[in-house]
UniProtKB/Swiss-Prot annotation:
Pfam family of the protein (one): MBOAT
Alphabetized InterPro entries for the sequence: LPLAT_7/PORCN-like, MBOAT_fam
Full protein name: Membrane-bound glycerophospholipid O-acyltransferase 1
Keywords: Acyltransferase, Endoplasmic reticulum, Lipid biosynthesis, Lipid metabolism, Membrane, Phospholipid biosynthesis, Phospholipid metabolism, Phosphoprotein, Transferase, Transmembrane, Transmembrane helix
Topology in the lipid bilayer: Multi-pass membrane protein
Amino acid sequence: MAAEPQPSSLSYRTTGSTYLHPLSELLGIPLDQVNFVVCQLVALFAAFWFRIYLRPGTTSSDVRHAVATIFGIYFVIFCFGWYSVHLFVLVLMCYAIMVTASVSNIHRYSFFVAMGYLTICHISRIYIFHYGILTTDFSGPLMIVTQKITTLAFQVHDGLGRRAEDLSAEQHRLAIKVKPSFLEYLSYLLNFMSVIAGPCNNFKDYIAFIEGKHIHMKLLEVNWKRKGFHSLPEPSPTGAVIHKLGITLVSLLLFLTLTKTFPVTCLVDDWFVHKASFPARLCYLYVVMQASKPKYYFAWTLADAVNNAAGFGFSGVDKNGNFCWDLLSNLNIWKIETATSFKMYLENWNIQTATWLKCVCYQRVPWYPTVLTFILSALWHGVYPGYYFTFLTGILVTLAARAVRNNYRHYFLSSRALKAVYDAGTWAVTQLAVSYTVAPFVMLAVEPTISLYKSMYFYLHIISLLIILFLPMKPQAHTQRRPQTLNSINKRKTD
């Protein structure tokens, strides 16, 4: 009896469109990745068209909302097929909460429904679809929508359910005084610029963009007259888009070469685990983790360029008078690669997710904000065991790094030479620490993670624990935190 024919590649294992399968076969790239890139490139051209031909001055806000939503829905269905139903169900459930829930509870209900649904989908990908390796990863858009749903719910709660004097300055600026219409809600969550790869953004900024007030609003915030402009300028995003597309192209080339040469599976092969020396393992781990970055640089920078091409993402004017289009930037590659502290690295990686975590968790929880923020970040990313190894290790490293900095940094500030030595040393330590910490994040499963850490003798865990145990830490109050509000600021001024 003849054996059942096997598919020629894994590229058919997708619920999205198979129209581009010949291109997938030609390039040797999985079909879901081809669909993603093609959708983002089409979105880029659509964004230019959207900005030029559907300008706010000549096109109503409703039309702009509708077009952005229709394109977004089409892209989601093209990439994910029937899996896109999960996205639409979550959006509709949370809009029902937006309409029916009281403003005092709207943020709680939205948060638990969105995070709960996302977690169920994460679990199904692991335990039903076996880590999702042979199926399209539909969780990406769901994660972005979850961020937007919860961000909007908290900002509506701030605007309608809290007193102005109880808000921080940032919460006051972003508070929403009127619940969005159904069209505005759909457009904010499903617009074609960010539905596939993000990033998350604030509802006020998005509505200002749709209504044509986004750039002027940002210029007024930075006081454009003091920047040397005699009339209100009209900055073009074209230069920023070209620059970001250049970064995208370089990232793609690195992904096709470096990432293929140093796959993460190298970290569990026989040579690495049993034969390589410890210094060789340190260096090789760093190289492999560096090689895993270009795909993130590519996806996030391209998503940023798409938003900019549509005219969204203007952040103001820098100190040199240059227009900045980094409001939605998700990373700062230079600061990542030159980071001299764990904190600096994290602040410049997945920036919009860090902003979301700060908005819905860190600034609001009364106890243990760092630990709870790490836990929320892990839950949002998924339920792969590797994520939890990364975030638990990250908590240890963060606390240890804080202790070292507080106890020793001031000794190196007396001269430029000492500061240079300190910066060089902390750069090397930071890069090695990040490589060690994030390796489980890309390995996903328990067995390869334990194998890697055993081969590294759990060195960073041990060092971090020793530092935490034996170096004096700044005393942390375990009583309820009091976030800085407009009321507390005004009270301090009058004291």
